[in-house]
Each structure stands twice: as structure tokens, then as C-alpha cells.
Amino acid sequence: MNRPFAKADGRFVFCGGLRWHRSAIGLYFPRTLAGELAIMSQRGIVPVDQLWLSIRREAESVLASDPMFGASVSAAILDHRDFGGALSHQIGERLGRNTADRQRYSRIASEVFQASPYLVDAASRDLQSIVANDPARPALLPPLLNFKGFIALQAWRVSNWLWRQDRIDLALLLQSLSSDSLQVSIHPSASIGTSVFLDHGTGVIVGAFAVIGDEVTFMQNVTIGRKRALPGRAPRIGRGVYLSSGATILGDISVGDYAKIGAGCVVENDVPSGCTAVGVPARLTNCPEPGIPA
């Protein structure tokens, strides 16, 4: 019988009958295809087709072990040809209030993903970021089906594409639906990178013209927006920034790469790369020594 987290050689542990392997950044993932993808994602991004294969295998396993729940999994995953189709279905299911609406919004998302395959690739990176950074979600299927922060972000990607195509009213409609259904409001004019993680996905507000870099993590109740004095200028958030719960970032400011914003912090001035901002108003701490990379 395996002892919980009994170390073998420092590279893996045993827990719950599974062999969990240690990733390059010290996180453990189960020895499954999804777990191996998580480890691979530390070295580079897994292609969409390979990710989709892993998701389908997880869905097939669920269908075999739990036929009652498996029927829902079939509709969400196995009935679709590719990752974009499954994403479109999830967006429609989450935003629609009746069958006709769900079909309509799913069709809109599908058309956008077909017109811009890059958005599907971006979604795959977002999903991999969840698995790589949240040990509580070692598989791909649960966040895809149940994590509203992930779906809200993909709905925003659709609305942002529509906004850039000058389909303003439809873009704003999707924002409103996402806010109502998912408690995440991201303006279609914002700019957001990839490998972005909306943990908990509740109470997140990103205002117009905000710029969010790659690998940013949002906790719940984060607000990023403009000030009344400069309505055309919004915050710019760098790569790898961690935004703790209740953080508020306002105005024409920059938050540098890999900075951390503390819980409940109100930031109205620039935060240099690698620094931590805490308090109300924010003060800086734990900044890198001069000449040392953040």
C-alpha cells in the first residue's frame, strides 16, 4: 500500500495510488497524460491538437466510470470535433438563458474561432496555465467544464475579436452576459495576453483600454480601471504579475513584470518589476536589489 506522499528519489511521490512527478518548478502532477502535459508545459506550450487528445481521453475515462455524469461530458466534449468546438459549446452554455440563446452564442463563438484560430491556441495556453499553476486541478477536464474564470476569459477573447471587427454592440452584449452569468466583466477593448489564470473567477473587473500581459494571475475581486481625470488611459500590467484578492489598480500606471499586488491593496502609482505592493495606499516592499533581475 502506498504511503501518502512517500518520497522515492525527490523526483516523484506516491499518493492515492498514483505516482506524482515533480515538475521543473517544484509542483507535483499525476502520472497521467494530463499530468505529463502539465510537466511538458513547463518546458514549452503543448500544441492544441495534443491538448485536445488528452481532454478527449479524460472524457472517455469519465464516461466509462460514471455513465450518468458521462452523458454531460459527451455533450460538452465528445460530441465535438476539436477544442474550438468544445469551447464554443461551453461559452454558449454559460452565457445563454434558454436553448435558443445557448445555440446562438455558441454559433457566434464558433464563427469567431474559425475566423481566428489564434484564439483557440490562446485558450489552450490559458488552460495549461491553470493545470501548471494550481495543484488542486491536476487534470484538464475539470477546469474546462467547471471553472467559470476560464470560460469568462474565452468569452472575452470572442468579444475582443468582435470589437476589433467594429461589431461593437455584439461585443458589449457578450461582456454584459459574462458579467451577469459569470461575475467577470472585462471590457472588449482591453488587451490580454495568454497563459492568464482567473482563479475563482468572481468579482473580476477589467476596464476599457487596460493592458494585461502574459502569465498574469487574478484572484477574486480584482479591479483594474481608469481614473476620471484621465479617462483615455488605463493601467498596464506586465508579464507574470500576481494580483491578490481585492486588489484595485487605477489610472495611467504600469505594474512591472513579475510584481505582486497584495490583498486589498489600492495602487495608483507605478510598481517596478519584481516589487510587491501592499496597503492602502500602496507602498513598495521586497524590491530586487539594483542590478539583480526581478
Language model regions located:
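Structural signal for interior beta-strand "rungs" in well-ordered beta-sheet cores
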Residues: S179-E289
